[in-house]
């Protein structure tokens, strides 16, 4: 798919102060409603890295599925060197450059993207799902496995579909969602061009057998496989 032109400091800011300002600015561009059109294809995205890799290589995968059948239609992969070290709250600047390259390897644009990470449930309102969604101007959902900020507003039931709000500074920033009976919950938030109710609905609709929805589960597997293949010299994808 064709990628938009992106302002340089939206991806590689010179320092964390600039990065924080960029996050606040881009958070103001998040559209918290939608999607506006039919969703026929969905993409899951995730990244993988070698443990203690001083080079900072990020291996990204985007897996495109048919929304109705969950058939895998395409897989895009790319490796990039992260422009900044890992700093909590600034994950997008490490991972989004590689993910954009992986999106560029696809032949078509997804109708909806599920991201392994936070959307607007972030100190400055721009987790990786919101960062990616705004840059691509594509409906995006953050499906995180842990809390970055906030606390559940109530006790979560043990059955699939149980949910409570995740609240921070007096406002709801995500939904704590039980995606499978008696497993740890997910933290689902708007990324861009989708409302919270639709984000939860799609997360459940695309899940079932596992804790993770199928798109991000497949992307997790694809990113790990790409990293392992790179280590053996057998990887195919977009390099540096």
UniProtKB/Swiss-Prot annotation:
UniProt binding sites for Mg(2+): 46, 116
Keywords: Cytoplasm, DNA damage, DNA repair, Endonuclease, Hydrolase, Magnesium, Metal-binding, Nuclease
Cysteine disulfide partners in this protein: none
A Gene Ontology term for the protein's cellular component: cytoplasm
GO molecular function, one term: deoxyribonuclease V activity
Site location (Interaction with target DNA): 86
Transmembrane segments: none
Subcellular location: Cytoplasm
GO annotation, biological process: DNA repair
Cofactor(s) required, per the database record: Mg(2+)
Domain of life, per lineage: Bacteria
Annotated catalysed reactions: Endonucleolytic cleavage at apurinic or apyrimidinic sites to products with a 5'-phosphate
Pfam family membership, one: Endonuclease_5
EC number: 3.1.21.7
Gene3D superfamilies registered for this protein in UniProt: archaeoglobus fulgidus dsm 4304 superfamily
Family named by the database record: Belongs to the endonuclease V family.
Role description: DNA repair enzyme involved in the repair of deaminated bases. Selectively cleaves double-stranded DNA at the second phosphodiester bond 3' to a deoxyinosine leaving behind the intact lesion on the nicked DNA.
Protein name: Endonuclease V
Organism name: Rhodospirillum centenum (strain ATCC 51521 / SW)
Encoding gene, per UniProt annotation: nfi
